[in-house]
């Protein structure tokens, strides 16, 4: 779950129609997404139409001959990628952190939880709910990974290490939304029906990360997102402890640790791609950054607020949970992690991609500095249905 670069330049919007454009490095190829938020019926009631993507997206951009690379990496993935998974019997489960329903002290435990949650501020609740909703849209993310050529689960139960990883990764991630959902439900501080509607809308809307069925692009995207999610959950853990809820702090910290482990796995894949096919990989990395990393929940909607994602991400930016600075820092980290500056023997396109990537973090930071002033001037109180319509500065 992350969102901050959208506040700088990623999206432009109106009250009823979002137009998400992307500038591809493929020359004339482009991808545009039109999201229809709502329409009006004859009686003046809003009829929601799930966000739709006009099919002008680039698809199947990886040359067919590259498929053999991922086939040849199956042995490597079996030995290196699957090692990042934890056995189910040794994994934490949501009930480890929640009141025990079979215990005679269950009601007292719930009461203690609710007392702790009274100290959580409304703006913190908005960020925590947004994190949870994003985690709950997990079906979308598994679907996205299974669009990638050469690594998708072809049968639903394929024994290839790529497919085994995707299913097991999904199973580990599934606990995150479950745990945060139950905790927020028990807290009594949020409108669960509005939250549940938002989750349903979001899963129904899908996402367009502009990965083009291309595993080079897909694994660069997941590397970025997992690190961003690690940062976000780590900051919600810190804030929960500051607000006096040590249990919630432990929950968010535990989720953050999972995200970091997953980040290591995905960055390891891209590291291997840089080793065996540096030119294609660096060009793909630059392509994803030119298009900007679209956030998993960018089609978020609750049936009321057409700009819900922007408002949510603004609160997260203000609290320091996930910011435009974090976006630049993640990019810098990946450039260094994959030794982009030290690549040699590249094509002319690869050299241009290398130069672009090495200079981009500084450019983003300058944009972020300019945007900060405009954001402060434009801030206003926004009602959030997740907290019964109470207003939060966004």
From Swiss-Prot:
User: What is this protein identified as?
Assistant: Stearoyl-[acyl-carrier-protein] 9-desaturase 1, chloroplastic
The record's comment on protein family reads: Belongs to the fatty acid desaturase type 2 family.
Q: Might you give the EC number(s) for this enzyme?
A: 1.14.19.2
Transit peptide range per the UniProt entry: 1-37
Inducing factors: Positively regulated by LEC1.
- Spell out the molecular function terms from Gene Ontology: metal ion binding; stearoyl-[ACP] desaturase activity
Provide the function of this protein: Converts stearoyl-ACP to oleoyl-ACP by introduction of a cis double bond between carbons 9 and 10 of the acyl chain.
**UniProt organism field:** Arabidopsis thaliana
Residues bound to Fe cation 1 are 135, 173, 176, 259
Q: What is the lineage of its organism?
A: Eukaryota, Viridiplantae, Streptophyta, Embryophyta, Tracheophyta
Which CDD domains does the UniProt record give?
Acyl_ACP_Desat
Q: Which UniProt keywords apply?
A: Chloroplast, Fatty acid biosynthesis, Fatty acid metabolism, Iron, Lipid biosynthesis, Lipid metabolism, Metal-binding, Oxidoreductase, Plastid, Transit peptide
Pathway participation: Lipid metabolism; fatty acid metabolism
Q: Name one Pfam family in it.
A: FA_desaturase_2
Q: So what does this thing catalyse?
A: octadecanoyl-[ACP] + 2 reduced [2Fe-2S]-[ferredoxin] + O2 + 2 H(+) = (9Z)-octadecenoyl-[ACP] + 2 oxidized [2Fe-2S]-[ferredoxin] + 2 H2O
Could you give a single Gene Ontology term from the biological process aspect? fatty acid biosynthetic process
**InterPro entries hit by this protein:** Fatty_acid_desaturase-2, Ferritin-like_SF, RNR-like
Query: Where is the protein localized?
Result: Plastid, Chloroplast
Cofactor(s) this protein requires:
Fe(2+)
* Superkingdom of origin: Eukaryota
User: Does the record bear Repeat in its keywords?
Assistant: no
What note does UniProt attach to the cofactor annotation?
Binds 2 Fe(2+) ions per subunit.
